Amino acid sequence: NQFYFYAWEITMSVQRLHVTSRYCEVAIAGNLVHLAGQLADDTSTDITIQTQQTLANIDRLLLEAGTDKSHILSVFIFLKDIEKDYAAMNAVWDAWLAEGHPPARTCVESKLYAAEVLVEMTVTAIRPD
């Protein structure tokens, strides 16, 4: 048996988009794209609208980074109340997801940074060649 090992060549330079003093919204290294935690623009709304807005922000940032949701490798989803909001979040997620391209996904309950935030998502994707 022969084993073949493949390695991604990742350059040492990192491109950062939407940079603040504390973090950036997007970090790109080679063909890897990492998004900071994304939230809804209007956190006074319910889980359905917050999830829609969060996913729209993800779409926008992925496009800006040169990729799209069909190239997402993994998503971490943080819900304020998983028992209450899991089904509604999943309904929006399922409608948004690129058919045939489900990413690796983790969904957990978490105390988020503000009481009105119901969902936050972090994403890792690749840029197509």
Regions found by a protein language model. Give the residues of each.
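N-terminal presequence-like segments and the immediate start of the first folded domain
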Residues: 2-129
